[in-house]
A protein has these predicted regions:
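Structural signal for interior beta-strand "rungs" in well-ordered beta-sheet cores
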Residues: 4-139
Length: 139
């Protein structure tokens, strides 16, 4: 097993990339990121700092995980966006970090988020959830 990183992808040397991960064209993976075994990032995915992605996830084109929370109370504290194992994010999905020290935004195991879903700060999506296109979950 090996890691496959497209030559146009920008992947931080500080990111923790497990075996059998595929990172597609024009993806960006920042410093404080861990990606679990067997996960695949399609083209143009952006994984920001403070993100943990489990095993066997699939992130489709133009998804962004770990964006800063849209919360006036957020002051830059350490917070997280977490995708557990076997999560699918279809095209244009956004998952923001939490607001509050050591707080988490979490997508639980086996969930499937369809095109254009937005998951705001501090949201927890339960296991095996299917969320339809263009849904916004407020923080």
């Amino acid at each position: 097993m090996t890691v496959h990183i497209h030559p146009t992808a920008l992947v931080s040397k500080k990111a923790q990339i497990s075996e059998d991960v595929t990172i597609g064209p024009y993806c960006i993976v920042e410093d404080d990121v861990a990606i679990g075994e067997g996960t695949k990032l399609e083209a143009f995915v952006h994984v920001r700092d403070c993100v943990r992605i489990g095993k066997n996830c699939r992130l489709f084109e133009h998804s962004v995980v770990g964006g800063l929370p849209q919360d006036f109370d957020f002051k830059g504290e350490n917070s997280w966006a977490v995708l557990e194992d076997c999560v699918t994010l279809r095209e244009n999905v956004t998952v923001h970090r939490a607001s509050g020290e050591d707080k988490k935004t979490v997508i639980r195991k086996g969930s499937f988020l369809m095109e254009g879903v937005h998951v705001a700060h501090n949201v927890v999506v339960g296991p095996n959830c299917v969320i339809a296109n263009k849904v916004g979950l407020a923080g």
